[in-house]
Curated annotation (Swiss-Prot):
Its EC number is 2.3.1.180. It is an enzyme of class 2 (transferase). The active site is at 112, 249, 279. Residues 250-254 are annotated as: ACP-binding. Homodimer. Its main location: cytoplasm. This is Beta-ketoacyl-[acyl-carrier-protein] synthase III. It comes from Streptococcus sanguinis (strain SK36). Keywords: Acyltransferase, Cytoplasm, Fatty acid biosynthesis, Fatty acid metabolism, Lipid biosynthesis, Lipid metabolism, Multifunctional enzyme, Transferase. The last Arg residue of the ACP-binding site is essential for the weak association between ACP/AcpP and FabH. Belongs to the thiolase-like superfamily. FabH family. The gene is fabH. SUPFAM superfamilies: Thiolase-like. Catalyzes the condensation reaction of fatty acid synthesis by the addition to an acyl acceptor of two carbons from malonyl-ACP. Catalyzes the first condensation reaction which initiates fatty acid synthesis and may therefore play a role in governing the total rate of fatty acid production. Possesses both acetoacetyl-ACP synthase and acetyl transacylase activities. Its substrate specificity determines the biosynthesis of branched-chain and/or straight-chain of fatty acids.
Length: 324
């Protein structure tokens, strides 16, 4: 049998930090209004770095930490909804930037579930026995997608990237997974709608900005996502008590509070960093994982059992249980 494992982690955020007070100077909001409803205090915003630039920093960090050459990589997957361009992909740009000439590379679009979907995909590549090493990165520059006159969305999002090195292993580390999509509810969270514009079509509508039905997304997370997490835990033949940490998409502190109660786990098992990053979509889980390793909460090769769960646009949601 062929198995995959997470052997290294890394993250990167733009230097510019924008606080709630900074936002209050350009829109009708306040630190109290934002933090009491979301838990967010700050977010990193790019001034000149693209999504592929952020992802490249993560890739370089992963290679430096692991001591492997870029030419040893078999694949690079970048989960993002904010690529530099429709083509070439952000992953292709990363491949060129780091000189990973032997790696195939592609982007995966599943919004805030993107890293989970991408990590599952990378695990399948390695478990096939055909590939040995790959990078899975979540990278976003969401600051270019928000309407900065809309306080209901502009205050929520930030820019950043995080990722992991996947390598072949002799023992099983990916214990259970579940992935879902419900396109019938897709209009509750949208971004980057591109209308038809050829000489042979009616002019379509363009909607470049992110739009969200906040209540619908909150209810979706507490209901559908919580249920799927419970089912994934059950399928692994583990209990919630067996999990060392649950790394959930960093959308809202209230979601984490309610999730802990619904799942019957100590709130301390759900670390949070949206206070400093805001919602970074596909980047949120790998950034959180990398910070937990930096802080010593999670130890690489420490045989800890970690649940990761993402949820967002599509609607999409997915959960992985792994040992690290």
């Amino acid at each position: 049998m062929n198995y995959a494992k997470i052997s290294q982690v890394a993250h990167y955020a733009p230097r510019q930090v924008v606080s709630n007070d900074d936002l209050a100077e350009i829109m009708d909001t306040s630190d109290e209004w934002i933090s009491s409803r979301t838990g967010i205090k700050n977010r990193h915003l790019s001034s000149d770095e693209t999504t592929s630039d952020l992802a490249t920093k993560v890739a370089e960090n992963l290679l430096q930490k692991s001591g492997i050459s870029a030419q040893d990589l078999d694949f690079i997957i970048v989960a993002t909804i904010t690529p530099d361009s429709l083509m070439p992909s952000a992953a292709a740009r990363v491949q060129a930037n780091i000189g990973a000439k032997n790696a195939f590379a592609f982007d995966l679009t599943a919004a805030c579930s993107g890293f989970i979907f991408a990590l599952s995909t990378g695990e399948k590549f390695i478990s096939s026995g055909r590939y040995q090493k790959g990078l899975v990165i979540g990278s976003e520059t969401l600051s270019k997608t928000v309407d900065w006159s809309d306080r209901s969305t502009a205050v929520l999002f930030g820019d950043g990237a995080g990722g992991v090195l996947l390598e072949s292993a002799s023992e099983q580390h990916f214990l259970a997974e579940s992935q879902f999509t419900d396109g019938s509810r897709g209009d509750s969270l949208t971004c980057g709608k591109i209308g038809l514009s050829s000489p042979f079509s009616e002019k379509g509508e363009n909607q470049p900005y992110l739009t969200m039905d906040g209540r619908a997304i909150f209810d979706f997370a507490i209901r559908d996502v919580a249920r799927s997490i419970k089912e994934t835990i059950e399928s692994s033949q583990l209990s919630a008590e067996d999990l060392d940490f649950l790394l959930l998409h960093q959308a809202n502190i209230r979601i984490l509070d309610k999730m802990a109660k619904k799942l019957g786990v100590a709130r301390e098992k759900l670390p949070a960093n949206m206070m400093e990053y805001g919602n970074t979509s596909a980047a949120s889980i790998p950034i959180l994982l990398s910070e937990c390793v930096e802080q010593g909460l999670i130890k690489l090769n420490g045989n800890q059992t970690i649940l990761m769960s993402g949820f967002g646009g599509g609607l999409t949601w997915g959960t992985l249980i792994v040992t690290i």
